[in-house]
């Protein structure tokens, strides 16, 4: 039997996981993140609030949208590692522009590279799945995600301590972040180059392995929802399609056609569609909040005139979000029945928090509202990820995640062009948060109506079932109207 199909040693996953976690820690240890707007507001940069809000920050959204599609494809085609290295190079380039650049144009260039950073982040989370066997997926996912939360929290705490206790200039925080990103690049050099990837380079593993497909390339979550005969038949059909069209030039077309068919099958589920819609719309609004909340804080309490606690707030918010996400695993809830109601309730909490942040003059109320927003979103997005991924293989989950993220970026771009951009309405930051609050209120209203429909339908079905079980076996059953459907 080919050695490529043998069970890997029990410690074969340890080395790439450790290196990737070290990379993740230093790439996410960014003390500068919480003090970007105060830094740009300093006399040395001499940027006004309208320039930052309406001219500089929107570039991140446009750059993220423009670079995500090619990055999504190239990440898999290049097998992750080169894109991981590009991730930190873009980070370093952005920090260099922020530190040494002057004027709106160079700050826009820095935001462009921040967009590249955001787009290439997918390589960090996708890399490890190409290096370890499926039985380690849950463990390594936990490590890789947890280390980024720890690093971001630690960076925010350090930044707050340095600013509050030593009066360290904001620029020094960016030098620290630049040094950490450089260390992350050093660790990226030691990442093993994957021999396979999720889509483009998966065929080599099938060719090298005479076992059925489910033993080599299909994740366990996919196996739990298919029979062995179905998996073997699917693998045989896939091989037949590849053999019938051996031209290398058509390989990309085959992959894209296969992706399209997978997406068509995935989105045929109404349940997945509704959760994906919430994911896309809520993520678009949430990203807008993250992008402009520091501008709102600067408006409520200018950093030149008062003490600010952005770092402490970011640390607490990140920790609160982690706790909210962690709590999802211990909730015993019928999400099929009550999931949309949960989306409605917590979307309403986000909307109320944004209204409070807009109308209150207290910076502490703004901080508290932000904590509620971040915790509520982290709680809901964890549920959404679980609901979407529960019946999908890893490959299909990656596709759905990519499409949902792209749709969210399209929505966010439209929102930015209309609400924020100087070529649009160019609204002040306080009015923007009024718009974002109304946006989440609409989301809450839509899913509240959806949840009422689901609960009423479930109640009607239960009453019909109870009536059927209590009827005498000798009584004739009335004919059910053909135009009544209890499926939702």
UniProtKB/Swiss-Prot annotation:
It catalyses: thiamine(out) + H(+)(in) = thiamine(in) + H(+)(out). It comes from the Eukaryota. Its main location: membrane. InterPro entries: Folate_carrier, MFS_trans_sf, ThTr-2. One of its GO terms (biological process) is thiamine transport. Disruption phenotype: Thiamine uptake by pancreatic acinar cells from knockout mice was found to be significantly lower than uptake by pancreatic acinar cells of the wild-type littermates. High-affinity transporter for the intake of thiamine. Unlike the human ortholog, lacks H(+)-dependent pyridoxine transport activity due to an absence of seven critical amino-acids required for pyridoxine transport. Belongs to the reduced folate carrier (RFC) transporter (TC 2.A.48) family. NCBIfam families: rfc. This is Thiamine transporter 2. It comes from Mus musculus (Mouse).
């Amino acid at each position: 039997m080919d050695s490529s199909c043998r069970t890997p040693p029990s410690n074969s996953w340890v080395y790439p996981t450790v290196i990737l976690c070290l990379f993740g820690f230093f790439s996410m240890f960014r003390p500068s993140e919480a003090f970007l707007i105060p830094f740009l507001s300093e006399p040395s940069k001499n940027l006004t609030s309208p320039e930052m809000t309406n001219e500089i920050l929107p570039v991140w959204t446009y750059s993220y949208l423009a670079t995500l599609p090619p990055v999504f494809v190239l990440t898999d085609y290049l097998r992750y590692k080169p894109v991981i290295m590009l991730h930190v190079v873009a980070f370093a380039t952005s920090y260099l522009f922020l530190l040494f650049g002057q004027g709106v144009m160079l700050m826009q260039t820095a935001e462009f590279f921040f967009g590249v950073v955001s787009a290439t982040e997918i390589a960090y989370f996708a890399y490890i799945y190409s290096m370890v066997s499926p039985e380690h997926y849950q463990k390594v996912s936990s490590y890789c995600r947890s280390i980024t939360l720890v690093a971001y929290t630690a960076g925010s705490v350090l930044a707050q301590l340095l600013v509050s206790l030593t009066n360290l200039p904001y620029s020094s925080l960016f030098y620290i972040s630049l040094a950490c990103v450089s260390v992350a690049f050093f660790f990226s050099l030691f990442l093993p180059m994957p021999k396979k990837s999720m889509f483009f380079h998966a065929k080599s593993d099938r060719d090298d392995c005479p076992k059925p497909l489910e033993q080599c390339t299909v994740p366990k979550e996919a196996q739990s929802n298919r029979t062995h005969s179905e998996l073997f038949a699917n693998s045989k059909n896939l091989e037949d399609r590849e053999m019938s069209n051996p031209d290398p030039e058509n390989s990309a077309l085959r992959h894209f056609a296969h992706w399209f068919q997978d997406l068509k099958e995935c989105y045929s589920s109404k349940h997945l569609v509704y959760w994906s819609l919430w994911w896309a719309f809520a993520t678009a609004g949430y990203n807008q909040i993250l992008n402009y909340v520091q501008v709102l804080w600067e408006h409520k309490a200018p950093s030149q005139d008062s003490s600010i606690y952005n770092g402490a707030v970011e640390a607490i918010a990140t920790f609160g979000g982690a706790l909210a996400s962690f709590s999802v695993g211990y909730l015993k809830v019928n999400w099929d029945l009550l999931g949309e109601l949960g989306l409605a309730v917590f979307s309403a909490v986000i909307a109320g928090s944004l209204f409070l942040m807009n109308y209150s003059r207290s910076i502490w109320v703004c901080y508290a509202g932000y904590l509620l927003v971040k915790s509520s979103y982290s709680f809901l997005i964890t549920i959404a990820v679980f609901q979407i991924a529960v019946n999908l293989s890893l490959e299909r989950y990656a596709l759905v995640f990519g499409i949902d993220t792209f749709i969210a970026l399209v929505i966010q771009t439209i929102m930015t062009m209309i609400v924020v951009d100087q070529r649009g309405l160019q609204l002040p930051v306080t009015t923007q948060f009024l718009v974002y609050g109304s946006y989440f209120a609409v989301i809450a209203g839509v899913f509240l109506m959806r949840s009422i429909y689901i609960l009423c339908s479930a109640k009607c079905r239960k009453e019909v079932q109870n009536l059927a079980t209590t009827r005498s076996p000798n009584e004739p059953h009335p004919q059910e109207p053909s135009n009544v459907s209890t499926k939702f």
